Curated annotation (Swiss-Prot):
PANTHER family noted in UniProt: BTB AND MATH DOMAIN-CONTAINING PROTEIN 36-RELATED, BTB AND MATH DOMAIN-CONTAINING PROTEIN 39
Alphabetized Gene3D superfamilies for the sequence: Apoptosis, Tumor Necrosis Factor Receptor Associated Protein 2, Chain A, Potassium Channel Kv1.1, Chain A
Record domain BTB: where: 164-229
Ranges of residues in domain MATH: 14-141
Source organism, top-level taxon: Eukaryota
Pfam families noted in UniProt: BTB, MATH_2
Listed PROSITE patterns: MATH
Lineage, broadest ranks: Eukaryota, Metazoa, Ecdysozoa, Nematoda, Chromadorea
Protein name, UniProt field: BTB and MATH domain-containing protein 39
Length: 334
C-alpha cells in the first residue's frame, strides 16, 4: 500500500518510482541514481554518507531530486511524497519515511532527510537491506502542479540529423543512434564503440531482433515505449548482455504490474536477471503454504536463491497461530 494512501484525494495520481543503489557498501560522499521520468519531469535519488564519520555515528541522508527538462528560470513543481527502503526479509522490515509536502524550484531542487538512519542499520550482515551490494528505495510521488515546464519531444527527423552519429544494424534493418548516449548507459557498448573499434560508426548487432534494439534505444532516449508480454524477455536479455540497468528496470516495472505473467515465471525471471524487487513483491503475493508446495513440486528448475526465499516464506507462514486457516482455507499446522 502506498505511504500516501491515507490521502485519498491524492491516491489516484500517485506514482511509485523505484531506484536501485549500487555498490552501496563502498559509498563515501554522494551517490546519484539513474533518472526516472514522470509527468515530463526527470527524478532521481541522492544518497550521502561519509567514511570520515566514526562508524558508530555514521549516518545516511536521502533526498529526492527534481530535474525538469525545457524549464524556465522560475519553474516550480509542487509535490507530496514519501519513501521506503525495501527489506528483502519482508514488508514489515521496511524503513518508511515521513510524508513530505514540498515545492521544488531552481533554488531548491532536492528534498529529503539529513541523517535519516545509521550506516550500520543498512549494512549489517543481518539487516536484510543489502542484496549483493545493492539496495532499493521506493518513492510514492504525487505531482500536484507545475509551472514553467514545457513538454517538448524532438522529432525523428531532427534526432537523426542533429543527434544520431552512428548506426546499429540487425535483421538487415538499421537503427540510427547517438553512440555517446548508448556508451554512457552501457560499459559493454562503451568498450565496443571507443576501445575495440574507435572511429567506427556502424555496428552489426547479432542475437537480438530489430524490435528489441529499437526498444532499447527508445528507453534510453526516454521516448514513449511500451514493454509487453511479447517483448519483455528479449529486452531483459538485451539489458543483461549489455549491462543497461534502465532497460532492465523498465522490464521490471512491467512485470510488477502485469497479470499476464505467472507468479512462477516472475520468480524464475527475478533470479535469472537479478530482479530483487520483483522477487520481493512477487513473494508478497504468495500467501498460502499449499501454493508454495505446488511451486516447489512443479518447478524443479527454480533457482537456488528463489528456492531458499520460498522456504523462508513457508517458515513465516507456519509461524501463524496454531489452528489458524491460511488463505486457501486449509490448516497447514503440523
Amino acid at each position: 500500500m502506498s505511504i500516501l494512501q491515507p490521502l485519498e484525494d491524492l491516491s489516484a495520481n500517485i506514482v511509485t518510482l523505484v531506484f536501485n543503489i549500487y555498490n552501496f557498501e563502498h559509498l563515501d560522499g554522494s551517490y546519484t541514481s539513474d533518472l526516472k521520468e514522470h509527468n515530463g519531469i526527470y527524478w532521481c535519488v541522492r544518497i550521502q554518507s561519509n567514511k570520515a564519520a566514526k562508524s558508530q555515528k555514521r549516518r545516511v541522508s536521502i533526498y529526492l531530486v527534481c530535474n525538469p527538462n525545457n524549464s524556465s528560470p522560475d519553474w516550480s513543481v509542487t509535490t507530496s511524497f514519501g519513501f521506503r527502503i525495501i527489506n528483502s526479509w519482508g514488508k514489515s522490515r521496511n524503513k518508511i519515511s515521513t510524508l513530505f509536502n514540498h515545492t521544488f524550484t531552481s533554488n531548491e531542487t532536492s528534498k529529503g532527510t539529513s541523517g535519516y538512519c545509521t550506516w550500520d542499520e543498512l549494512t549489517a550482515a543481518n539487516s536484510g537491506f543489502l542484496v549483493e551490494g545493492r539496495f532499493q528505495i521506493e518513492f510514492d510521488l504525487n505531482v500536484n502542479s507545475s509551472t514553467g515546464i514545457r513538454k517538448e519531444k524532438i522529432s525523428k527527423e531532427k534526432y537523426e540529423k542533429y543527434i544520431a552519429d552512428g548506426e546499429l544494424i540487425t535483421d538487415g534493418k538499421t537503427v540510427k543512434v547517438c553512440l555517446a548516449l548508448l556508451a554512457d548507459n552501457s560499459p559493454i557498448l562503451y568498450n565496443l564503440f571507443y576501445v575495440e573499434k574507435p572511429g567506427q560508426t556502424t555496428f552489426h548487432i547479432f542475437d537480438f531482433t530489430y524490435e528489441a534494439i529499437l526498444g532499447m534505444v527508445s528507453i534510453l532516449q526516454l521516448d514513449s515505449f511500451e514493454v509487453s508480454v511479447y517483448n519483455y524477455r528479449d529486452l531483459l536479455e538485451l539489458g543483461q548482455r549489455y549491462q543497461i540497468p534502465s532497460v532492465t528496470d523498465k522490464c521490471e516495472e512491467f512485470l510488477l504490474k502485469t497479470r499476464y505473467v505467472s507468479i512462477e515465471t516472475k520468480l524464475k525471471l527475478s533470479e535469472i536477471f537479478e530482479l530483487h524487487y520483483l522477487q520481493f513483491r512477487t513473494l508478497e503475493r504468495v500467501t498460502c503454504i499449499h501454493h508454495i508446495d505446488n511451486i516447489l513440486d512443479d518447478h524443479m528448475d527454480i533457482g537456488e536463491k528463489t528456492y531458499d526465499a520460498l522456504l523462508e516464506k513457508m517458515k513465516h507462514l507456519k509461524t501463524q497461530e496454531d489452528g489458524q486457516l491460511c488463505s486457501c482455507k486449509r490448516n497447514h499446522v503440523r
